[in-house]
């Protein structure tokens, strides 16, 4: 799964990963998710030729059966050897509600890649007090931090938006705040850092984590 808050660049990154895997000879199936009934992301990914199923009207974390059904449809139509799932931008607690059930029920059929959570560097710098700007509500910050708390890989996207020194400071701050995660830098737009991220996703199965507490 590739998660992250709204505006982190998830769909662009999913497309880049799918293109990378396809070029390497892998068959890819994509699953998109949103709270609305019309998923623009689905149309964009399908326009690039990727087999894509969508789960509208609710998050993976409360529609696990729909996620499994979508994977089943892709298996019947395309027989992908890699699934990439993009949860809704406000979704959290994915390890407890998606990863653990998948591993328990379908452990013989699926290998679970590390959970990547993308961040917009400008927003992250504001959330963690590294730059000035409009403040977010406590509820937004709570969800934002919880998403990062369960990540195996925290992926700073849109690296072209900050100066190198600011990116280094942000990366160090995220590593300090979330020591269980590996922090990477990429730009899905320019391609910078994508190979290193893709290698981390495909080379390691998701590590076992304690289920986090969500209020």
Features from the language model and the residues they span:
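Nucleotide-state-sensitive switch-loop elements of NTP-binding domains
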Residues: 1-3, 8, 12-142
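Canonical P-loop GTPase G-domain recognition
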Residues: 141-155, 159-215
């Amino acid at each position: 799964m590739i998660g992250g808050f709204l505006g982190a660049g998830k769909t662009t990154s999913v497309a880049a990963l799918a293109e990378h895997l396809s070029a390497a000879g892998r068959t890819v199936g994509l699953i998109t998710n949103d709270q609305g009934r019309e998923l623009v992301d689905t149309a964009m990914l399908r326009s690039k030729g990727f087999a894509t199923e969508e789960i509208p009207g609710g998050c993976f974390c409360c529609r696990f059966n729909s996620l499994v059904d979508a994977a089943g449809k892709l298996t019947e139509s395309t027989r992908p050897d890699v699934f990439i799932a993009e949860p809704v931008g406000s979704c959290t607690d994915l390890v407890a509600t998606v990863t653990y059930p998948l591993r328990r029920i379908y452990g013989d059929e699926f290998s679970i890649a590390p959970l990547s959570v993308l961040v917009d560097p400008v927003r992250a710098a504001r959330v963690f007090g590294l730059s000035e700007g409009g403040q977010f509500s406590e509820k937004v910050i709570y969800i934002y931090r919880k998403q990062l708390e369960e990540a195996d890989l925290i992926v700073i996207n849109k690296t072209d938006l900050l100066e190198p020194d600011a990116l280094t400071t942000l990366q160090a701050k995220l590593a300090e705040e979330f020591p269980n995660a590996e922090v990477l830098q990429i730009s899905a737009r320019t391609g910078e850092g994508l190979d290193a991220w893709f290698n981390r996703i495909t080379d390691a199965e998701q590590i076992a984590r304690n289920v986090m507490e969500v209020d």
